[in-house]
Amino acid sequence: MLRTMFTGKIHRATVTQADLHYVGSVTVDQDLLDAAGILPGELVAVVDVTNGARLETYTIAGERGSGVLGINGAAAHLVHPGDLVILIAYGLMDTAEAQTYEPRVVHVDERNRIVALGSDPADAVVGDVVRPPHAREHGRAREDAATTRA
């Protein structure tokens, strides 16, 4: 059986532009894509922290070091410049790989510059949100799940 697992995310990035008349997609600084392990053309979920909108689209590589995060096409009706968003990529993997896979988590500042890298999807950085009170450390949760199945 294949499982759909979280593989990488860019956390709380700021939307820098929106173009309703573009053909679609989300344009993302190539440095951020690389750090999150997301490829150009890859399916991503865009979760708007500002207004709660959630959509799926594909990525287009933006200029390295630019901090660009542009919402293109019809999604520009839902997500606007200045909104905080989370870009999330998922991948299919078998159970054995899913139990050991280390996702890539990229935390950015208000200008979409990388401030922290990690693999725990529940970790927060100083000045950001807090860790959910009942969240277990990512590696520990995997160990507990493996023990339960054994």
From Swiss-Prot:
Is synthesized initially as an inactive proenzyme, which is activated by self-cleavage at a specific serine bond to produce a beta-subunit with a hydroxyl group at its C-terminus and an alpha-subunit with a pyruvoyl group at its N-terminus. InterPro entries: Asp_de-COase-like_dom_sf, Asp_decarbox. Binds 1 pyruvoyl group covalently per subunit. Keywords: Autocatalytic cleavage, Cytoplasm, Decarboxylase, Lyase, Pantothenate biosynthesis, Pyruvate, Schiff base, Zymogen. Pathway: Cofactor biosynthesis; (R)-pantothenate biosynthesis; beta-alanine from L-aspartate: step 1/1. GO terms for molecular function: aspartate 1-decarboxylase activity. The keyword Cytoplasm applies. GO terms for biological process: alanine biosynthetic process; pantothenate biosynthetic process. Its EC number is 4.1.1.11. It is found in: Cytoplasm. HAMAP family: PanD (MF_00446). This is Aspartate 1-decarboxylase. It comes from Kocuria rhizophila (strain ATCC 9341 / DSM 348 / NBRC 103217 / DC2201).
